[in-house]
């Protein structure tokens, strides 16, 4: 007598009831809403960005501060610096956002930052006039423009992603770029330049006597001024070239 075995049936997926399907769909919708809300909060400049909305009325605030010879940009604001007989710091922003730009002096250095979330409608920047400038530090993401500087020595550090340009003349320029920002100093005539670039940015300088350039990163140093002495040390993928 032949015995016929019945074919085995494949394992069936568990059946979801209607209440389970409804709960699952609700969770997906809530997750999608959460993602949209998060994107709204973290995208600056968006019409939906969280925080204080600018009034659209441009205003200024003149800050009374102790004397300083160094400037540190810790926020995302743009800063213009000019050589002047008198020291002054003027903040430009929407009338209701002036307090979001912070200015304080510590150990002879003006520190410019910003606090809170906001969506500016009017141009937001800081104007600085200083009789003597010896140091610049761009740890934030803003941009700095310096004009008319005359100094025996200027030290510049750029660890952030911002950019800086400068014009004038100095005896010695020490500049270090650790981030991805660019330093446009071809308009600043320096007798001696010491340039170090650890990041991926670019340094433009004009050296009339000597240039000491170190490039352990992937950035580049481009120089003009036809210096009599050029010393280079390249250990990364970067370059030091006249241009």
Model-flagged regions — what are they?
Residues 2-99, 109-129, 238-243:
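Short acidic/polar N-terminal linker immediately downstream of export determinants
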Residues 60-64, 68-81, 100, 109, ...:
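Extended, compositionally simple hydrophobic/Ser/Thr-rich segments
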